[in-house]
Amino acid sequence: MDRTSLKFRRNKMKRNIFSSALLIALLLPTIALAQVKVVITPQERKMAEAITAAQLRDYLYFIAADEMEGRDAPSKGLDITANFLAMMASRLGFKPAGDNGTFFQNIDVRVDSPDAEKTKLAVIGKQFKYGDDFVRVTGTGDASNRPLVYGGAGWLVKSKGIDDFKGIDVKGKIVVLSARGMPNMNNLTQRPAGVTPADLQGERGVEWADPLTYATKSGAAGIIVIANEQINGSWNQVRNAFGRTSLLWEKLRPDTARTALPVLLATTSVGNEIMNGISAGAVTDLKPNASMTVAIKSEKKKTRNVIALWEGRDPILKKEMVAIGSHYDHVGVNPNAPGDDKIWNGADDDGSGTVGVLSIAEALAKAPVRPKRSVLIVWHTAEEKGLIGSEYFNRFPTVDIKNVIANINIDMIGRSKKEGDTDPRNKDLSGPNGTFLIGAELMSSTLGAVTLGTNNAYLKLDYDRKYDDPADTNRFFFRSDHFHYAVNGIPAVFWFTGVHEDYHQPGDHADKIDYVKMEKISRTIFLTLWELTDLKERPKVDKQLPPELTRR
């Protein structure tokens, strides 16, 4: 799962299918959940039993082996994994559905990484050390010997009376912000308390502005975000996260990595240097000057989605597809990481989803009968770099995207909270019979009815729906690959067993996976997929959509 984003992109894509589908839905009677009755036949149960814990274990130990070097996008280990997935799809009898009759969809990207030697920060003449004292967040450029000005959290939300730069002249200065949540290039600080996405209406930069937009529009020379205690307490992880490469899809995304205002994240000790001698809250315009230089290194590379088609049996319905996918990349190797383990194996994130999809593909191939509709499998690349693979596929599909009736996404289904576990990092991890179900009823009543009905008729897993709460700050629905299908007007549902102590850490190993739980979840997803392929009519978008899915 993509950590650094909460990355829904306001990229101006217009998806008229949303508004038209929603209008039709409003004119028709609401579909009652009871109208979709799911019955699992003995034959279907037998088909699901082709998925086994042993099978999942064997595949995952290969996918998450040290030899794959953490499956960074792009990397040799990721290419090996892609070739393995394509080979397995071919052996199982799937049709290639990528570019030019292959299983691959190639994506040209630019790979950026921080230039630690050239990225510098000095405050009142004191030089700080990259990595130990500060890291790059985004942007490039120089801001030499500039005054510092404190700008709070940096937000403007006129409808809520919030203006953190009110009365402050930031032009030509380096703005100091107090961290609120983990910074990323879309939100350097989290939205103010009580502000929802629905409040961010009107022209961006005028009626409302995130800190980067507000500082840029106000003429600031650079930004330093000062870590809070939570960030400071996990500085090694923070340093590793911001030290990794990032990808730019040059032809279609703005080159914010180079053109954005230079932004650094600094430790609290650096913040103390900046705030030294200043009475907190009494003075905003600070006396000290600072100099910052932010630089990156770049190279051109390719990365690939892996796409396969299992054709349905119905002569009419087989033109329609249920898409099921996962991301097969992780975050690679960090030679500067503390300790002996430098490889982020990504067994749970998202090796578990990758092999879960593979096991479902194998169950389809072993079934005595084909589904009515076709099944499209997409193993997405570069989810960890900003949902790049899924966005690319949805903007440049290798199949007729209008015929994709639903999307199933599997991202992190391998871990269980053990009895007596008091580690706060595991507080939201699901139990041995549980999983979080996200988005099932967000867009379509029918998708929700099939998803919930299948579980009730089968293994009765404990589905936790808490992340569907619009007020939930994790915003998981907007952080994995199903999001771009939803943007395309395709109802999507997401299985996820929760974050844990090894999330985006080198300890995410295959020997920590609960394979019995993975088996249960994968079997349930297989049958959910099967029931969707068997529907008389495709699921309609009949729900009031959140702003992130309509402002395109």
What are these model-derived regions, one by one?
Residues 130-254, 259, 311, 342, ...:
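Extracellular/luminal Protease-associated
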Residues 332, 472-519:
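Zn-dependent metallopeptidase/amidohydrolase metal-coordination segment
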Residues 34-96, 319-321, 542, 546, ...:
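N-terminal hydrophobic or amphipathic helices/low-complexity stretches enriched
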Residues 69-189, 303:
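Noncatalytic luminal/extracellular "stalk/propeptide" segments of secretory-pathway proteins
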Residues 361-388, 410:
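Short helix-loop-beta-strand segments that form the rim/entrance of peptidase-like active sites
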Residues 362, 366, 496-552:
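His/Asp/Glu-rich mid-to-C-terminal helical/loop segments that flank catalytic regions of hydrolases
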Residues 126-129, 166, 252-254, 261-272, ...:
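Metal-dependent peptidase/peptidase-like ectodomains
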Residues 38-44, 124-167, 251-346, 362, ...:
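Soluble metallo-hydrolase cores and metallopeptidase-like ectodomains found primarily
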